[in-house]
Each structure stands twice: as structure tokens, then as C-alpha cells.
């Protein structure tokens, strides 16, 4: 999985709110 806007999938829930995993 990767961040929807690019980069690796965030590890922490609060970061996933900013950059969801796709």
C-alpha cells in the first residue's frame, strides 16, 4: 500500500487521516 498522494503508507493513524493509504 502507498499514500494516496504518493510516498509510503503512513504508520500512524493520525498521519493516515492526512494521507490515507491506497
UniProtKB/Swiss-Prot annotation:
Its main location: secreted. Expressed by the venom duct. One of its GO terms (cellular component) is extracellular region. Keywords: Acetylcholine receptor inhibiting toxin, Disulfide bond, Neurotoxin, Postsynaptic neurotoxin, Pyrrolidone carboxylic acid, Secreted, Toxin. It is found in: Secreted. The modification Pyrrolidone carboxylic acid is found at residue 1. It comes from the Eukaryota. The keyword Secreted applies. Disulfide bonds join 3-21, 4-19, 9-22. GO terms for molecular function: acetylcholine receptor inhibitor activity; toxin activity. The keyword Secreted applies. Negative results: does not inhibit mammalian neuronal alpha-3-beta-4/CHRNA3-CHRNB4, alpha-4-beta-2/CHRNA4-CHRNB2 and alpha-9-alpha-10/CHRNA9-CHRNA10 nAChRs. The cysteine framework is III (CC-C-C-CC). Probable competitive antagonist of fish muscle acetylcholine receptor. Inhibits postsynaptic nicotinic acetylcholine receptors (nAChRs) from fish (zebrafish and goldfish) and frogs (IC(50)=0.1 uM). Protects these receptors from block by alpha-bungarotoxin and alpha-conotoxin EI. Does not block nAChRs at the neuromuscular junction of Rana pipiens. Shows a weak inhibition on mammalian adult and fetal muscle nAChRs (alpha-1-beta-1-delta-epsilon/CHRNA1-CHRNB1-CHRND-CHRNE and alpha-1 beta-1 gamma delta/CHRNA1-CHRNB1-CHRNG-CHRND) (IC(50)=3-45 uM). Belongs to the conotoxin M superfamily. This is Conotoxin MIIIJ. It comes from Conus magus (Magical cone).
Amino acid at each position: 500500500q502507498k499514500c494516496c498522494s504518493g510516498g509510503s503508507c503512513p504508520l500512524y493513524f493520525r498521519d493516515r487521516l492526512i494521507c490515507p493509504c491506497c
